Structures are given as structure tokens and as C-alpha cells.
Amino acid sequence: MIENNMTTNQINSLNRRVQDLKRYLDYNKKKSRVLEIDLELSSPKTWTEQISIKKLNKEKYLLNSIIQNINEIEENIKEVVIFLELAIETQDNLVFKESLLEIQKIEQEIKKLEFYRMFSKKNDHYDCYIDIQSGSGGTDAQDWSKMLLRMYLRWADKKGFHTEIIDESIGEIVGIKSSTIKVSGEYAFGWFRTETGIHRLIRKSPFDSGKRRHTSFSSIFIYPDINEKIDININYSDLRIDVYRASGAGGQHVNRTESAVRITHLPTNIVTQCQNNRSQHKNKEQAMKQMQSKLYEIQMRKKQEEKQKIEQNKSDITWGNQIRSYILDNSKIKDLRTGVEKNHVQSVLDGDLDDFIEQSLIMGL
């Protein structure tokens, strides 16, 4: 005989969690904000500013994504209640089992939305940049930086993000000296921001004829791509702008013209580079945009006292500021902040970062 006590408790629990979701995700405020955005988009004044249109449409998309997900969950709960009542009334085991499976699916959807609580920081909804900088360790470190680049590109692809390599400096023998990736997608900065720090690799070096153990370091810095006017003062006399020949893809063109641009902020020694456009003007515009976003993120980190000064992070890519160790010989990867440890090394290097990143977000790092 089919009993309804257990399923009633499950349904009540799901309904409570949905109401909690509505409260801490500001469901009603989000619905009101969508109406406000529609009014703004209908204004002729807005249509003279392309950046504003893009920003408003993206905000509306993110808001509607959450609103629609909550609405669908509520509808699915109502439907499963109807099927449960039918199953109990007719004592139909098949319908009852299908209803239990549907309850499990609804619970998974609720869990996904509950995770959005982690994206509570001001800039979490923006796209982001990933700076990879090779540290101490010579050829091994440059090879390690290339491995990290591949790992992040794989993870971003699994999450449905769009990626673009903005700049890349090829290593002397193998790997890369540095690289900048742009990641676009829903809450890209929120997902990636806790990866900022030093990543340490320990392995038997393939570049050492004696196959001795080597330790290599690579620095990762994540900052948001803020598509609006940033309230940060940059004195242009503090900038040094260099142009050079691009070293990446682009055929013969990149060898004939100095289209790549490097901008250095002299007071902090922070550098941004771009070489993925054929136009020097576009590369300069992109590099300046990165510089503004980068300086803004550093300013925010200093205010919040979440990280040490960026100058220390950039100048001492060795033992300090480590967040994760990758010990290949022992098949162990350990996050030094969260304690998360995995033994499937190749899986992680192939982009299986969910456990590390999700735990860091849950802990509020």
C-alpha cells in the first residue's frame, strides 16, 4: 500500500526551500527590476548608448534566469503533487515511482539555485580575465603555466563559458611565460575569483636528465571585466605604452606590423597586454580596459583586506600566498585553504575543478 506521509514531508520541505530561495535571492525585487529595465530599454535616450543597452540586456538576462528557474520549480512541485495524489488514490506504483524521481530532479534544481547564494559579491556577475604568470622554476614553471592554461580552458568549456586568449608570451623552450584569458558567461568572475593565488607543482621533471624532483610555481590573478565607467583615477603620465610584433596566431600579418600593445602602470608595475586584434588601436583599447578593471579589482581587494598587496603577489611567486599544491608523483592535489584533496590528478588537470572551487565559495573565500 502506498503511504503519503513521507512524500508529504518531502513536498513541504521543497516548498519551504523555494520560499527561502525567493527571500535570499530577492525574487520580488528582481521581478520589479526587470520591469524597470524594460522601461529603460524603451527610452530613446538609452538607445543612443550602446554600452548601456548591452549592460541592461545582460542584467535582464541574469535576473530572468533566476526568476524563470524559480517559477519552473514551483510549477513542477504543483504537478508532482497532482501525480502523487493520483498514485495514492489509484494505488499506482508506477506513477508513484515516477513522482519520486521527479521529486529528486526538483531537489537538484533547488540545490543549483541555492548555490547562487555564493555569488553575493559586488562584481560576481561580470565576465572576467585570468592572468597566468610563470614564476620560479625555469622551463618547468613555463610548462606548468601552460598546463594551468589548459586546465582553466577545459573547466570553462565544461561550465559553458566562452573563452578567448587575449595575450600570450611563449616560453623559451616549452610552455608559456604568461597569458591572459577572457572568460565570458553567467557569473564568470564569481566562479573564478577564488583561484587567485600561487599554484605549486611538484614532479619529476621531464626536462631533467636525472629525473629529479622539481618544484615550480605559477601565479594566477582573476579580475572582473567591468563593462561600464569605472570610478578609478588613472594618471596617464603613470602609464608606459609599448608596441611590439604579435607572437600568436594571425599569419604573416603579425610579423609585418607592430600591432600588439603592452601597457605598464609604473607606480604598481602592473602590466596588461593585448595582441589578438590586427588593429593596434583596438589592442590598445582592450589593454587599457583590462588595466582599468585590474586596478579596480586590486583597489577593492585592498579595501576588503581579503588579499595581500598585489605587488607582493606579483613579485614573489614562490612559497608565499600558495593556495594549492599539485604533487604529481604522489597523485595528490591539495587545496591549502579549504583542505579539499583529490587523487585523480589527470582528471583535475583536464578541468575537473568543481570540488575545489565550490568548497572555496561555500567557505566564503
From Swiss-Prot:
Q: According to the UniProt entry, where is the signal peptide?
A: none
Q: What about PTM?
A: Methylated by PrmC. Methylation increases the termination efficiency of RF2.
N5-methylglutamine PTM positions = 252
Annotated Gene Ontology MF terms? translation release factor activity, codon specific
Q: Does the keyword Cytoplasm apply?
A: yes
Query: Is the Iron keyword given for this protein?
Result: no
- Location(s), subcellular: Cytoplasm
**Keywords, comma-separated and alphabetical:** Cytoplasm, Methylation, Protein biosynthesis
Remaining remarks: The gene for this protein contains a UGA in-frame termination codon after Leu-25; a naturally occurring frameshift enables complete translation of RF-2. This provides a mechanism for the protein to regulate its own production.
Entries under PANTHER family matching the protein: CLASS I PEPTIDE CHAIN RELEASE FACTOR, PEPTIDE CHAIN RELEASE FACTOR 2
By sequence similarity, the record places it as follows: Belongs to the prokaryotic/mitochondrial release factor family.
Function comment: Peptide chain release factor 2 directs the termination of translation in response to the peptide chain termination codons UGA and UAA.
Q: State what protein this is by name.
A: Peptide chain release factor 2
Originating species: Buchnera aphidicola subsp. Acyrthosiphon pisum (strain APS)
Q: What is the lineage of its organism?
A: Bacteria, Pseudomonadati, Pseudomonadota, Gammaproteobacteria, Enterobacterales
- Name of the gene: prfB
